[in-house]
Regions:
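TRNA-recognition modules of translation machinery and tRNA-sensing kinases, especially anticodon-binding
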Residues: 27, 130-426
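N-terminal alpha-helical targeting/anchoring segments
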Residues: 1-135, 149, 153
C-alpha cells in the first residue's frame, strides 16, 4: 500500500506505475481515491469546525448560568445536544469514506524500483547472472519421482489415496536428505548472524491482507472453516506479522531472521498441481530469510540476501542463475524481486526454486510496523528470500548429483546431517 499523500501529490506517477505493470483496469482507482479523499478531508473539516463551535458554546453555558440567564443557557444546551447528532452523522460518513479509500489503496500496486525491467509477464524476465557450471552427463536422467522411487524414497500413490494430488510420502534416505537440506540451511543462516525462529503456522485475516494482495490471497491461502485463521503459504507471512502494530527502536534495526515452517498453498491458477511430481504441490517445507530494516538500507539488504542464496547453492555444487522479475511479473506489494533458478541437467535448462523480494514499506504500512528514529517515526522496510524450499531443492539436488547406476552423491556439507553417509544407493 503506497502513501496516500504521495498518491495525492503524484497521481500521474502512480498511474504510470500501473501502466508499467500492465494493469490498466486499475487506472480509474487513482482518481477515485483522490475524489473520496477530498470528500473525507472536507467531512473532517466540517466535524472539526462543529466541535470547535460546540466547545465555544459549552464554555458560554457556565457564564450564562452564573449571570442568571437560565433561558439562554437552556437554549445553548439544546444547541450543543443537536451538535451531537450532527457530529455522529459526520463521523459515520468519514468512517465510510476512509473505508472506501482503503479498499482502493489496497488494490493499487506499490511503486516499483526504477531498475525493474518493463515487461508484461514472466516470459519477459531478464537474466542477470549465473553461478556455477551447468553440467549435462553422458547418461539419461530420469524424471525426479522416478529417481526417488528407485531409491525407495517416495510414495505418491498412497498420498493420493490419503489426500489427493499435490501431496507425497517421503521415506528412508530421501526423507532423511529432505531433513538434512533443511537443517543445513538453518545452520547456514545462523552462521550468517540470522536469528532462528519457528513461527505460528496459522495467521489471522488481518495479517494475511497485510502481507499480500487480494489476488495472491485467493490463489494461495487455505482458510480454516469457522475460524478467522489461514494456513500460511510461507513463514514470511507469520514472521512479518510478528511485528504488527509494533514501534521498533531504530537501534534494534536491522532485524535479521531465518524461519522454518511447513507451507500450504492452493496453487489455484494457470499452472495448477502436477499429476505426478513434487514441483508444484499443496504442502511443502521451507527455510526462509526475513529482514526488517531502515528504508535507506533495503536495497543493500536485497543484494545481501541474494548473495546468501548464491553461497548456499555453491556450497551444494548446484549451478544457479538470477532472473530479474519484470514489472508485469511482480506481485502488487513488491518493489523489486528476482527468481532463484537452479540448473536441471534433465531438462537442460534452469527452473525456479525460490525468490528474493524487497517490498519497501508496503507490508509495514498495512500492518502498522513503524520505527522510532532520532528524526521521528517512519515505516520500516521488509524483505524476504527463500533459503531452501524442498522438495524443489531436492529435484535440483538429485539431478545434479545423480550417478549412472541410479545412486546419488551426498556433498560433504550434508554428510554430518546424514550420519556420515556419502551416497544414497538403490
Amino acid at each position: 500500500m503506497i502513501d496516500l499523500k504521495f498518491l495525492r501529490e503524484n497521481p500521474e506517477v502512480v498511474k504510470q506505475n500501473i501502466r508499467n505493470k500492465f494493469q490498466d483496469q486499475k487506472l480509474p482507482l487513482v482518481d477515485e481515491v483522490i475524489e473520496l479523499d477530498a470528500q473525507r478531508r472536507t467531512t473532517q473539516q466540517q466535524a472539526d469546525d462543529l466541535k470547535q463551535k460546540r466547545n465555544t458554546i459549552s464554555k458560554q453555558i457556565g457564564a450564562l448560568m452564573a449571570q442568571g440567564k437560565k433561558e439562554e443557557a437552556e437554549e445553548a444546551k439544546k444547541e450543543v445536544a443537536e451538535f451531537g447528532d450532527e457530529l455522529a452523522a459526520l463521523d459515520k460518513k468519514q468512517a465510510e469514506l476512509e473505508e472506501e479509500v482503503k479498499k482502493r489503496m489496497m488494490i493499487i500496486p506499490n511503486i516499483i524500483d526504477p531498475s525493474v525491467p518493463i515487461g508484461k509477464d514472466d516470459s519477459e524476465n531478464v537474466e542477470v547472472q549465473r553461478f556455477g557450471e551447468p553440467k549435462v552427463p553422458d547418461f539419461e536422467i530420469p524424471y525426479h519421482t522416478d529417481i526417488m522411487e528407485k531409491l525407495h524414497g517416495i510414495d505418491l500413490d498412497s498420498a493420493r489415496r490419503v489426500a489427493g494430488n499435490g501431496f507425497y510420502y517421503l521415506m528412508g534416505d530421501i526423507a532423511r536428505l529432505h531433513s538434512a537440506v533443511i537443517s543445513y540451511a538453518r545452520d547456514f543462516m545462523i552462521d550468517r548472524g540470522f536469528t532462528y525462529c519457528v513461527p505460528p503456522f496459522m495467521i489471522r485475516s488481518e495479517v494475511v491482507t497485510g502481507v499480500m494482495s487480494f489476488a495472491e490471497m485467493d490463489a494461495m491461502m487455505y482458510k480454516i472453516e469457522g475460524e478467522d485463521l489461514y494456513l500460511i503459504g510461507t513463514s514470511e507471512h507469520s514472521m512479518i506479522g510478528k511485528f504488527i502494530d509494533q514501534m521498533i527502536p531504530e537501534a534494534q534495526l536491522p532485524q535479521t531472521l531465518t524461519s522454518y515452517s511447513p507451507c500450504f498453498r492452493k496453487e489455484k491458477g494457470a499452472h495448477g498441481i502436477e499429476e505426478r511430481g513434487v514441483y508444484r504441490i499443496h504442502q511443502f517445507e521451507k527455510q526462509e530469510m526475513i529482514v526488517i530494516c531502515k528504508p535507506e538500507d533495503s536495497m543493500i539488504w536485497y543484494d545481501k540476501l541474494w548473495k546468501n542464496t548464491v553461497d548456499l547453492f555453491r556450497s551444494l555444487d548446484i549451478p544457479v542463475r538470477q532472473l530479474e522479475c519484470c514489472s508485469g511479473d511482480l506481485a502488487d506489494l513488491k518493489v523489486k524481486s528476482c527468481d532463484v533458478e537452479a540448473w536441471s541437467p534433465r531438462q537442460k535448462k534452469y527452473f525456479e526454486v525460490g525468490s528474493c523480494s524487497n517490498l519497501g514499506d508496503a507490508q509495514a504500512r498495512r500492518l502498522r510496523i513503524r520505527v522510532a528514529g532520532e528524526n521521528g517515526k517512519y515505516f520500516a522496510h521488509t524483505l524476504n528470500n527463500t533459503v531452501v524450499a524442498p522438495p524443489r531443492m531436492l529435484i535440483a539436488f538429485l539431478e545434479n548429483n545423480l550417478n549412472a547406476d541410479g545412486s546419488v552423491n551426498i556433498p560433504e556439507v550434508l554428510r554430518p546431517y546424514m550420519g556420515g553417509k556419502a551416497k544414497i544407493e538403490p
